[in-house]
Protein backbone atom coordinates (compact mmCIF):
# COMPACT_ATOMS: atom_id res chain seq x y z
CA UNK A 1 0.00 0.00 0.00
CA UNK A 2 1.35 3.43 -0.97
CA UNK A 3 0.92 5.96 1.84
CA UNK A 4 0.29 9.42 0.45
CA UNK A 5 0.85 12.72 2.19
CA UNK A 6 -2.48 14.05 3.48
CA UNK A 7 -3.53 17.69 3.58
CA UNK A 8 -3.64 19.09 7.11
CA UNK A 9 -5.01 22.19 8.81
CA UNK A 10 -4.40 25.61 7.15
CA UNK A 11 -7.85 26.71 8.36
CA UNK A 12 -6.78 30.37 8.60
CA UNK A 13 -5.42 30.44 5.03
CA UNK A 14 -8.40 28.48 3.68
CA UNK A 15 -10.86 30.90 5.32
CA UNK A 16 -8.98 33.91 3.93
CA UNK A 17 -8.84 32.58 0.35
CA UNK A 18 -12.48 31.44 0.38
CA UNK A 19 -13.52 34.88 1.66
CA UNK A 20 -11.61 36.46 -1.24
CA UNK A 21 -13.33 34.13 -3.71
CA UNK A 22 -16.76 35.01 -2.32
CA UNK A 23 -16.17 38.70 -3.06
CA UNK A 24 -15.85 40.64 -6.30
CA UNK A 25 -12.50 40.29 -8.11
CA UNK A 26 -10.57 43.54 -7.67
CA UNK A 27 -6.98 42.67 -6.75
CA UNK A 28 -4.18 40.26 -7.74
CA UNK A 29 -3.13 37.94 -4.91
CA UNK A 30 0.42 36.62 -4.62
CA UNK A 31 0.78 33.49 -2.48
CA UNK A 32 4.37 33.07 -1.34
CA UNK A 33 6.42 31.27 1.30
CA UNK A 34 9.52 29.15 1.93
CA UNK A 35 10.28 26.11 -0.24
CA UNK A 36 7.95 23.17 0.41
CA UNK A 37 5.73 25.10 2.82
CA UNK A 38 2.59 23.79 1.08
CA UNK A 39 1.49 26.65 -1.22
CA UNK A 40 0.45 24.44 -4.13
CA UNK A 41 -1.08 21.83 -1.81
CA UNK A 42 -3.17 24.57 -0.18
CA UNK A 43 -4.53 26.05 -3.40
CA UNK A 44 -5.23 22.59 -4.87
CA UNK A 45 -7.05 21.54 -1.71
CA UNK A 46 -9.26 24.63 -1.94
CA UNK A 47 -10.14 24.33 -5.62
CA UNK A 48 -10.65 20.56 -5.47
CA UNK A 49 -12.55 20.29 -2.19
CA UNK A 50 -13.92 23.66 -1.10
CA UNK A 51 -15.33 25.31 -4.23
CA UNK A 52 -18.81 24.70 -5.60
CA UNK A 53 -19.58 24.16 -9.28
CA UNK A 54 -20.37 27.87 -9.47
CA UNK A 55 -16.64 28.41 -10.07
CA UNK A 56 -14.52 27.61 -13.12
CA UNK A 57 -10.82 27.31 -12.32
CA UNK A 58 -8.01 27.63 -14.85
CA UNK A 59 -4.87 26.28 -13.18
CA UNK A 60 -1.61 26.94 -15.06
CA UNK A 61 1.55 25.43 -13.59
CA UNK A 62 4.77 26.85 -15.04
CA UNK A 63 6.89 24.52 -12.88
CA UNK A 64 7.26 21.90 -15.61
CA UNK A 65 8.15 24.36 -18.39
CA UNK A 66 11.42 25.96 -19.40
CA UNK A 67 10.15 29.28 -20.73
CA UNK A 68 12.55 31.55 -22.58
CA UNK A 69 10.32 33.04 -25.28
CA UNK A 70 6.71 33.95 -26.14
CA UNK A 71 6.06 30.66 -27.98
CA UNK A 72 6.85 28.58 -24.90
CA UNK A 73 4.65 30.80 -22.72
CA UNK A 74 1.72 30.32 -25.11
CA UNK A 75 2.31 26.56 -25.15
CA UNK A 76 2.25 26.58 -21.34
CA UNK A 77 -1.07 28.38 -20.87
CA UNK A 78 -3.18 27.11 -23.78
CA UNK A 79 -4.32 23.60 -24.67
CA UNK A 80 -5.74 22.23 -27.92
CA UNK A 81 -6.74 18.94 -26.30
CA UNK A 82 -10.26 18.14 -25.19
CA UNK A 83 -9.38 15.70 -22.43
CA UNK A 84 -6.82 13.16 -21.22
CA UNK A 85 -7.34 11.13 -24.38
CA UNK A 86 -5.69 13.89 -26.43
CA UNK A 87 -8.70 14.43 -28.68
CA UNK A 88 -8.21 17.79 -30.40
CA UNK A 89 -10.58 20.73 -29.99
CA UNK A 90 -12.13 21.39 -33.39
CA UNK A 91 -14.03 24.66 -33.03
CA UNK A 92 -15.33 27.41 -30.74
CA UNK A 93 -18.47 25.44 -29.82
CA UNK A 94 -16.32 22.70 -28.28
CA UNK A 95 -14.40 25.36 -26.35
CA UNK A 96 -17.68 26.81 -25.02
CA UNK A 97 -18.81 23.34 -23.99
CA UNK A 98 -15.56 22.76 -22.07
CA UNK A 99 -15.63 26.06 -20.22
CA UNK A 100 -19.34 26.07 -19.34
CA UNK A 101 -20.22 22.39 -18.86
CA UNK A 102 -16.93 20.51 -18.53
CA UNK A 103 -14.76 19.82 -15.48
CA UNK A 104 -14.61 22.46 -12.73
CA UNK A 105 -10.80 22.68 -13.05
CA UNK A 106 -8.98 23.02 -16.36
CA UNK A 107 -5.17 22.85 -16.57
CA UNK A 108 -4.97 24.99 -19.69
CA UNK A 109 -7.01 27.54 -21.60
CA UNK A 110 -8.88 25.56 -24.31
CA UNK A 111 -8.42 26.76 -27.87
CA UNK A 112 -9.11 25.23 -31.31
CA UNK A 113 -5.90 24.07 -32.99
CA UNK A 114 -6.28 26.46 -35.92
CA UNK A 115 -6.64 29.44 -33.56
CA UNK A 116 -3.71 28.22 -31.46
CA UNK A 117 -1.33 28.19 -34.43
CA UNK A 118 -2.27 31.80 -35.23
CA UNK A 119 -1.24 32.99 -31.75
CA UNK A 120 2.42 32.35 -32.52
CA UNK A 121 2.33 34.87 -35.34
CA UNK A 122 0.40 37.55 -33.47
CA UNK A 123 1.23 39.95 -30.64
CA UNK A 124 1.05 38.72 -27.06
CA UNK A 125 -1.98 40.97 -26.50
CA UNK A 126 -3.92 38.85 -29.00
CA UNK A 127 -3.33 35.83 -26.76
CA UNK A 128 -4.51 37.85 -23.77
CA UNK A 129 -7.59 39.05 -25.68
CA UNK A 130 -8.49 35.45 -26.50
CA UNK A 131 -8.14 34.52 -22.83
CA UNK A 132 -10.27 37.54 -21.89
CA UNK A 133 -13.03 36.39 -24.26
CA UNK A 134 -12.97 32.91 -22.70
CA UNK A 135 -13.32 34.35 -19.20
CA UNK A 136 -16.21 36.56 -20.35
CA UNK A 137 -18.00 33.48 -21.71
CA UNK A 138 -17.49 31.71 -18.38
CA UNK A 139 -19.00 34.70 -16.56
CA UNK A 140 -21.88 34.84 -19.04
CA UNK A 141 -22.68 31.19 -18.29
CA UNK A 142 -23.21 32.09 -14.62
CA UNK A 143 -19.89 30.79 -13.30
CA UNK A 144 -17.11 32.78 -11.61
CA UNK A 145 -13.75 32.35 -13.38
CA UNK A 146 -10.59 31.87 -11.29
CA UNK A 147 -7.09 32.04 -12.81
CA UNK A 148 -4.19 30.44 -10.91
CA UNK A 149 -0.61 30.90 -12.12
CA UNK A 150 1.78 28.61 -10.21
CA UNK A 151 5.55 29.30 -10.11
CA UNK A 152 5.02 32.55 -12.03
CA UNK A 153 8.69 33.54 -11.59
CA UNK A 154 9.51 31.13 -14.44
CA UNK A 155 8.59 33.87 -16.95
CA UNK A 156 10.34 36.78 -15.19
CA UNK A 157 13.14 37.19 -17.74
CA UNK A 158 11.22 36.49 -20.95
CA UNK A 159 11.63 39.41 -23.37
CA UNK A 160 9.18 40.11 -26.21
CA UNK A 161 9.81 42.09 -29.38
CA UNK A 162 10.79 45.72 -28.86
CA UNK A 163 12.52 44.72 -25.60
CA UNK A 164 9.27 44.56 -23.63
CA UNK A 165 9.16 42.12 -20.74
CA UNK A 166 6.40 39.51 -20.93
CA UNK A 167 5.81 39.80 -17.17
CA UNK A 168 5.04 43.52 -17.47
CA UNK A 169 2.50 42.84 -20.24
CA UNK A 170 0.98 40.01 -18.21
CA UNK A 171 0.64 42.20 -15.12
CA UNK A 172 -1.19 44.87 -17.14
CA UNK A 173 -3.59 42.20 -18.37
CA UNK A 174 -4.14 40.80 -14.85
CA UNK A 175 -4.89 44.31 -13.55
CA UNK A 176 -7.49 44.62 -16.32
CA UNK A 177 -9.09 41.30 -15.27
CA UNK A 178 -9.29 42.29 -11.61
CA UNK A 179 -9.27 46.01 -10.80
CA UNK A 180 -10.81 47.24 -14.07
CA UNK A 181 -13.26 44.56 -15.29
CA UNK A 182 -13.81 42.75 -11.96
CA UNK A 183 -14.05 39.68 -14.17
CA UNK A 184 -11.77 37.02 -12.74
CA UNK A 185 -10.06 36.15 -9.45
CA UNK A 186 -6.29 35.88 -9.94
CA UNK A 187 -3.80 34.05 -7.70
CA UNK A 188 -0.07 33.95 -8.48
CA UNK A 189 2.04 31.42 -6.56
CA UNK A 190 5.80 31.55 -6.11
CA UNK A 191 8.45 29.91 -3.93
CA UNK A 192 11.03 32.43 -5.19
CA UNK A 193 11.15 35.13 -2.51
CA UNK A 194 13.42 37.35 -4.64
CA UNK A 195 10.70 37.35 -7.30
CA UNK A 196 8.13 38.40 -4.69
CA UNK A 197 10.52 41.13 -3.52
CA UNK A 198 10.91 42.29 -7.14
CA UNK A 199 7.13 42.49 -7.63
CA UNK A 200 6.60 44.14 -4.25
CA UNK A 201 9.37 46.73 -4.76
CA UNK A 202 8.86 47.52 -8.45
CA UNK A 203 5.73 49.57 -7.80
CA UNK A 204 3.97 48.40 -10.98
CA UNK A 205 1.25 46.74 -8.91
CA UNK A 206 1.04 49.32 -6.12
CA UNK A 207 -2.53 49.25 -4.81
CA UNK A 208 -3.36 46.43 -7.23
CA UNK A 209 -1.85 43.43 -5.44
CA UNK A 210 -1.85 41.80 -2.01
CA UNK A 211 0.47 39.16 -0.59
CA UNK A 212 -0.55 36.02 1.32
CA UNK A 213 2.19 34.18 3.24
CA UNK A 214 1.98 30.38 3.48
CA UNK A 215 4.71 29.64 5.99
CA UNK A 216 5.91 26.43 7.59
CA UNK A 217 3.65 25.29 10.46
CA UNK A 218 4.09 26.95 13.84
CA UNK A 219 5.13 24.62 16.67
CA UNK A 220 1.61 23.92 17.94
CA UNK A 221 0.34 22.98 14.47
CA UNK A 222 3.49 20.97 13.70
CA UNK A 223 2.98 18.83 16.83
CA UNK A 224 -0.68 18.24 15.90
CA UNK A 225 0.42 17.27 12.38
CA UNK A 226 2.80 14.71 13.90
CA UNK A 227 -0.06 13.24 15.96
CA UNK A 228 -2.23 13.05 12.84
CA UNK A 229 0.49 11.36 10.74
CA UNK A 230 1.54 8.96 13.50
CA UNK A 231 -2.03 7.68 13.72
CA UNK A 232 -2.45 7.51 9.91
CA UNK A 233 0.94 5.98 9.04
CA UNK A 234 2.27 4.25 12.17
CA UNK A 235 -1.07 3.47 13.83
CA UNK A 236 0.35 4.58 17.17
CA UNK A 237 0.95 7.68 19.29
CA UNK A 238 4.29 9.44 19.45
CA UNK A 239 5.74 10.38 22.82
CA UNK A 240 6.09 14.08 23.64
CA UNK A 241 9.86 13.56 23.65
CA UNK A 242 9.82 12.16 20.10
CA UNK A 243 7.66 15.02 18.85
CA UNK A 244 9.94 17.60 20.46
CA UNK A 245 12.95 15.90 18.90
CA UNK A 246 11.39 15.93 15.42
CA UNK A 247 10.44 19.60 15.77
CA UNK A 248 13.91 20.56 17.01
CA UNK A 249 15.44 19.01 13.90
CA UNK A 250 13.01 19.86 11.08
CA UNK A 251 10.72 22.54 12.52
CA UNK A 252 7.29 22.97 10.95
CA UNK A 253 8.04 22.09 7.33
CA UNK A 254 5.19 19.71 6.38
CA UNK A 255 7.12 17.66 3.82
CA UNK A 256 9.98 17.00 6.27
CA UNK A 257 7.64 16.00 9.10
CA UNK A 258 5.86 13.61 6.75
CA UNK A 259 9.16 12.16 5.52
CA UNK A 260 10.41 11.53 9.06
CA UNK A 261 7.24 9.80 10.26
CA UNK A 262 6.93 7.76 7.07
CA UNK A 263 10.50 6.50 7.49
CA UNK A 264 9.76 5.59 11.12
CA UNK A 265 7.93 2.56 9.71
CA UNK A 266 11.29 0.92 9.14
CA UNK A 267 14.05 3.03 10.75
CA UNK A 268 14.91 4.45 14.17
CA UNK A 269 13.92 8.07 14.72
CA UNK A 270 17.39 9.16 15.87
CA UNK A 271 18.99 7.58 12.79
CA UNK A 272 16.54 9.35 10.46
CA UNK A 273 17.10 12.77 12.02
CA UNK A 274 20.87 12.43 12.32
CA UNK A 275 21.16 11.46 8.65
CA UNK A 276 18.96 14.37 7.54
CA UNK A 277 21.09 16.84 9.50
CA UNK A 278 24.32 15.25 8.31
CA UNK A 279 23.24 15.57 4.66
CA UNK A 280 22.19 19.20 5.10
CA UNK A 281 25.43 20.03 6.93
CA UNK A 282 27.52 18.40 4.20
CA UNK A 283 25.70 20.40 1.51
CA UNK A 284 26.39 23.62 3.39
CA UNK A 285 30.02 22.64 3.98
CA UNK A 286 30.59 22.03 0.26
CA UNK A 287 28.83 25.30 -0.57
CA UNK A 288 31.23 27.22 1.71
CA UNK A 289 34.28 25.25 0.52
CA UNK A 290 33.43 26.18 -3.07
CA UNK A 291 33.77 29.85 -2.14
CA UNK A 292 37.54 29.34 -1.70
CA UNK A 293 37.79 28.82 -5.46
CA UNK A 294 35.01 30.84 -7.04
CA UNK A 295 34.03 34.50 -6.87
CA UNK A 296 30.23 34.62 -6.84
CA UNK A 297 28.52 37.65 -8.34
CA UNK A 298 25.00 39.01 -8.20
CA UNK A 299 23.26 41.64 -10.28
CA UNK A 300 21.74 44.54 -8.39
CA UNK A 301 20.13 47.43 -10.29
CA UNK A 302 22.25 46.69 -13.42
CA UNK A 303 25.45 46.54 -11.33
CA UNK A 304 27.44 43.30 -11.07
CA UNK A 305 28.65 42.91 -7.48
CA UNK A 306 31.21 40.38 -6.27
CA UNK A 307 30.51 38.56 -3.01
CA UNK A 308 33.32 37.63 -0.61
CA UNK A 309 33.37 34.41 1.42
CA UNK A 310 33.87 36.36 4.66
CA UNK A 311 30.66 38.31 3.97
CA UNK A 312 28.78 35.01 3.51
CA UNK A 313 30.21 33.60 6.75
CA UNK A 314 29.41 36.78 8.68
CA UNK A 315 25.83 36.74 7.38
CA UNK A 316 25.31 33.10 8.36
CA UNK A 317 26.83 33.68 11.80
CA UNK A 318 23.90 35.97 12.60
CA UNK A 319 21.71 32.85 12.65
CA UNK A 320 23.73 31.06 15.34
CA UNK A 321 21.56 32.71 17.99
CA UNK A 322 18.51 33.79 15.98
CA UNK A 323 16.16 32.05 13.55
CA UNK A 324 15.07 35.37 12.02
CA UNK A 325 17.02 38.58 11.39
CA UNK A 326 16.15 41.91 9.78
CA UNK A 327 17.10 42.27 6.12
CA UNK A 328 18.92 45.45 7.24
CA UNK A 329 21.45 43.28 9.12
CA UNK A 330 22.86 41.64 5.98
CA UNK A 331 24.15 43.54 2.91
CA UNK A 332 21.64 43.20 0.07
CA UNK A 333 24.02 41.52 -2.44
CA UNK A 334 24.94 38.92 0.20
CA UNK A 335 21.38 37.97 1.09
CA UNK A 336 20.41 37.93 -2.59
CA UNK A 337 23.12 35.32 -3.18
CA UNK A 338 22.05 33.24 -0.16
CA UNK A 339 18.40 33.39 -1.19
CA UNK A 340 19.31 32.37 -4.76
CA UNK A 341 21.14 29.36 -3.30
CA UNK A 342 17.99 28.44 -1.30
CA UNK A 343 19.83 28.82 2.00
CA UNK A 344 17.81 31.82 3.18
CA UNK A 345 14.18 32.88 2.69
CA UNK A 346 13.29 36.56 2.37
CA UNK A 347 9.93 37.90 3.49
CA UNK A 348 9.99 41.31 1.74
CA UNK A 349 6.69 42.41 3.25
CA UNK A 350 8.04 42.00 6.81
CA UNK A 351 11.69 42.75 5.94
CA UNK A 352 12.79 39.47 7.54
CA UNK A 353 15.39 36.86 6.56
CA UNK A 354 15.48 33.31 7.91
CA UNK A 355 16.87 29.92 6.84
CA UNK A 356 14.70 28.07 4.30
CA UNK A 357 14.18 25.36 6.93
CA UNK A 358 15.00 24.36 10.51
CA UNK A 359 17.29 21.73 8.99
CA UNK A 360 19.38 24.41 7.29
CA UNK A 361 19.31 26.45 10.50
CA UNK A 362 20.65 23.47 12.45
CA UNK A 363 23.31 22.90 9.79
CA UNK A 364 24.42 26.55 10.04
CA UNK A 365 24.70 26.32 13.83
CA UNK A 366 26.58 23.01 13.67
CA UNK A 367 29.01 24.08 10.95
CA UNK A 368 29.76 27.55 12.29
CA UNK A 369 30.05 26.48 15.91
CA UNK A 370 33.80 27.19 15.95
CA UNK A 371 33.56 30.52 14.10
UniProtKB/Swiss-Prot annotation:
SUPFAM superfamilies: P-loop containing nucleoside triphosphate hydrolases. Coiled coil: none annotated. It comes from the Archaea. Keywords: ATP-binding, Nucleotide-binding. Belongs to the archaeal ATPase family. ATP binds at residues 33-40. This is Uncharacterized ATP-binding protein MJ0147. GO terms for molecular function: ATP binding. PANTHER family: AAA+ ATPASE DOMAIN-CONTAINING PROTEIN, YALI0E33429P.
